[in-house]
Amino acid sequence: MFFTMTTPHTIAIDGPAASGKSTLGKLLADHFGYIYFDTGVLYRALTYVALEQAVDLADAAALAKLAQTSNFEVLPPTIADGRQYTVLANGEDITWPLRAANVERNVSQVAAQSAVREALRDIQRQIGKAGHVVMAGRDIGAVILPDAQLKIYLDASVEERAQRRAQELNARGRSISYREVLDDLTRRDAKDAANTFLAADAITITTDGRSPEEVFQAILGLIGVEAQA
């Protein structure tokens, strides 16, 4: 793959849960002065609202209608409490509740509904069309932003991802074991497989044993080398 510019205007990052997409996305967005948008928060937000309103998570039509009638906003951080962004659902700040155990357990089921994905894709594409954005998800490079100038696919073993996620959750005050997280990620991988796509022109990076900074520097190096080729 060769780029015609050193700085891509649109960056797509895909990969399985806890592979480092959010961390890398934020680093790249900060470096280039771009917006960072994690599309997973939309599915989490919809899952949260559906659970709050006791909507049947197996009812694709009801979920799609809820997605269309709800007002979801992803904003820059409004509170300095470690968040990377603020998520509002119908005006309510739900940023941290999105990481609750019940949302974690059910988001893959919600995201697997094709009607739901279609209902939320327009929001994602509109954000991407504006440019100067780093967007992370499962199908960004292949489906949402197929014309993105830089496409990255992050991968890591489920064991590595479980270790990272367990450390992250425990650091936030949620007591959870590595085994619990490993089992949850294994289930999520199975559910997410049908909606996780590797774009043909994506750069694949395996992040096992590599720090976020090492992955970030590797991406910058690849951009520089290919831009000059």
From Swiss-Prot:
Chain positions recorded as ATP binding sites: 15-23
A Pfam match: Cytidylate_kin
Domain of life: Bacteria
SUPFAM superfamilies assigned to the protein according to its UniProt record, in alphabetical order: P-loop containing nucleoside triphosphate hydrolases (SSF52540)
EC number(s) given by UniProt: 2.7.4.25
Annotated GO CC locations: cytoplasm
Reactions accelerated catalytically: CMP + ATP = CDP + ADP; dCMP + ATP = dCDP + ADP
Keyword line: ATP-binding, Cytoplasm, Kinase, Nucleotide-binding, Transferase
GO biological process: pyrimidine nucleotide metabolic process
Location in or out of the cell: Cytoplasm
Signal peptide: none
InterPro entries, sorted: Cytidylate_kin (IPR003136), Cytidylate_kinase_dom (IPR011994), P-loop_NTPase (IPR027417)
Family, similarity comment: Belongs to the cytidylate kinase family. Type 1 subfamily.
The protein, known as: Cytidylate kinase
